[in-house]
């Protein structure tokens, strides 16, 4: 019974640590780039787009498709960086313990 109480306490501490990590992530802004930095997208830690910067040299009414592709690529880059950062933070909180597929904390 004592071991069960200890496990429950550890689980509660991990849950609190994960909530703190989630709060830290939500406060962050992550930037992705494309076209050698000519298009930049900023996402919140929740993955919501906060801003976009486009170098004026790219604005060509005759070639909107290239600009559209670069915006998508910059967003994809920012999203990838966010996912990597979230995974790194999760490793810190869980001490490298992998959770079963589909299991998310807090419970």
From Swiss-Prot:
Organism of provenance:
Acidiphilium cryptum (strain JF-5)
Q: What is the lineage of its organism?
A: Bacteria, Pseudomonadati, Pseudomonadota, Alphaproteobacteria, Acetobacterales
Family that this chain belongs to: Belongs to the YbaB/EbfC family.
User: Function, please?
Assistant: Binds to DNA and alters its conformation. May be involved in regulation of gene expression, nucleoid organization and DNA protection.
Origin superkingdom? Bacteria
Assembly mode: Homodimer.
Pfam families per UniProt: YbaB_DNA_bd
Q: Which GO terms describe its cellular component?
A: bacterial nucleoid; cytosol
Keywords on this record? Answer: Cytoplasm, DNA-binding
What is this protein called in UniProt? Nucleoid-associated protein Acry_1999
- InterPro entries (UniProt xref): YbaB-like_sf, YbaB/EbfC
Concerning Gene3D superfamilies, the annotation shows:
Nucleoid-associated protein YbaB-like domain
Give the molecular function GO annotations.
DNA binding
């Amino acid at each position: 019974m004592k071991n069960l109480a200890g496990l429950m306490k550890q689980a509660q501490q991990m849950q609190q640590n994960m909530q703190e990590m989630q709060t830290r992530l939500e406060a962050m802004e992550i930037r992705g780039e494309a076209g050698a930095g000519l298009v930049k997208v900023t996402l919140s830690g929740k993955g919501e787009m906060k801003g976009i910067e486009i170098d004026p040299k790219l604005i060509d009414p005759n070639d909107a498709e290239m600009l559209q592709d670069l915006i998508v690529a910059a967003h994809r880059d920012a999203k990838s960086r966010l996912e990597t950062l979230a995974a790194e933070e999760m490793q810190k909180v869980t001490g490298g313990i992998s959770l079963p597929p589909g299991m998310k904390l807090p419970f």
